[in-house]
Amino acid sequence: MNNQYTINSLCLGKNNSLCIEIQGMILRRGEGKVTITGSLSTSAYETMVLARNILLASSEVFSQYDYHLHFAYPATQKNGTSWGLACYLLLSFISGSLAYIPNIAATGELDLFGNVLPVKYIDDKLAAWGKSQCELLFIPKNNIVPDIAGIYQVSTLRDVRDILSTKFG
């Protein structure tokens, strides 16, 4: 089992949007605990806990291991709640609950029931994504985005389970 994965999350920095890599791996057999490193604000940390708990409630496989997530660039404080979708996807990939999709980015807040909620500053986040090397972006269905069809591959999600019906390529 490959246990090292990455995903990019679009977030707001001090003066602009950033595309921050989140790295994840299985630590050992365990019970679904997640160790987190990389300068997260309280709200960003709580968002990661929410993503973990959604998986704990819906995946028997997830609870068999303990994990480590590292948010790259530790000197950059990670604020806000739009990390939720990226954390959920990364933890799903690591645990094997979802087949790994390489070279993607995600932004979206989650609620306790797995709904993907709209995020602020979507235009800025799309600009940051356009500068990245990511080929596919997952965003909330309810975010209004400029017409980017044909330029980028974007998949909109209303619920985390929507990823299962997403067509790639």
What is each PLM-predicted segment?
Residues M1-G169:
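Peripheral, non-AAA+ core regions of ATP-driven protein-machinery
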